[in-house]
Amino acid sequence: MSDMRLIVAGAGGRMGRALIRAITETPGAVVAGALEAPTSALLGQDAGTLAGLPPSGVKLSADLWALSAEADGIVDFTVPEATIANVAIAAQRGMVHVIGTTGLTASDDAVISSVTSRATVVKSGNMSLGVNLLAALVKRVARSLDDGFDIEIVEMHHKAKIDAPSGTALLLGEAAAAGRGVALAEHSIRGRDGVTGARKAGDIGFASLRGGTVTGDHTVIFAGPYERIELTHKAEDRMIFAHGALKAALWARDQGPGLYSMADVLGLSDI
């Protein structure tokens, strides 16, 4: 099979540059395009050079339609508005769309779901192997423990992150809720402040910390009577997300239309 030709959306950002490096060093994939916002000062620059690699000949562009003429997929770690704009073009072109963008709303998710009858989409709040294994563990632990164990999720990221809770924290919250057989939306508690009253049994709490250059720390706490279980993942480099996203793209190339998660990619969906 020929190399998978991938477009990197948000190519000038930190994740975009990590993706360019990951694709360049992985057999079976090539950078076919580098997408940036129309207002970016980086348009026209070489994608390889921006990623700290030798020049690749691929220039940053704001025209996804033109970039996608001969591409097989797009890997998208941008912002919700950009991702939703990319969804229709990716579906129309028949490209695999790997979405790692966080901060998506319910209406954004509905737009993404609307194309999956004809498009192959992999969407996850976190693309790393470790976090997705953690989510599987969280689901199993939540299934095993009753409401006597309170669930709290604590996450910390660098000071430039613009959304909270993180997509990973929400992924872990969904895993905990699934383990308990409930809907996260009905039990999620965020941003406690002031006199909140006693904690209700069954709540799933979130606390978000921001500061420094932290790539991503997540801890799921199961606090019971006189004992506490803590499950933690610490990301030390964005390359774990880049390699996970690339693995998802290569896997999705052989799948039919549908909406998939990293649990599907890693064979964890039945855990």
Swiss-Prot record:
GO terms for cellular component: cytosol. Keywords: Amino-acid biosynthesis, Cytoplasm, Diaminopimelate biosynthesis, Lysine biosynthesis, NAD, NADP, Oxidoreductase. The active site is at H157, K161. NCBIfam families: dapB. GO terms for biological process: diaminopimelate biosynthetic process; lysine biosynthetic process via diaminopimelate. HAMAP family: DapB. This is 4-hydroxy-tetrahydrodipicolinate reductase. It catalyses: (S)-2,3,4,5-tetrahydrodipicolinate + NAD(+) + H2O = (2S,4S)-4-hydroxy-2,3,4,5-tetrahydrodipicolinate + NADH + H(+); (S)-2,3,4,5-tetrahydrodipicolinate + NADP(+) + H2O = (2S,4S)-4-hydroxy-2,3,4,5-tetrahydrodipicolinate + NADPH + H(+). Catalyzes the conversion of 4-hydroxy-tetrahydrodipicolinate (HTPA) to tetrahydrodipicolinate. (S)-2,3,4,5-tetrahydrodipicolinate binds at H158, G167, T168. NAD(+) binds at G10, A11, G12, G13, R14, M15, E36, G100, T101, T102, S124, G125, N126, M127. One of its GO terms (molecular function) is NAD binding. It is an enzyme of class 1 (oxidoreductase). InterPro entries: DapB_C, DapB_N, DapB_N_CS, DHDPR_bac, NAD(P)-bd_dom_sf. Belongs to the DapB family. The keyword Heme does not apply. Its EC number is 1.17.1.8. Pfam families: DapB_C, DapB_N. It is found in: Cytoplasm. The gene is dapB. Pathway: Amino-acid biosynthesis; L-lysine biosynthesis via DAP pathway; (S)-tetrahydrodipicolinate from L-aspartate: step 4/4.
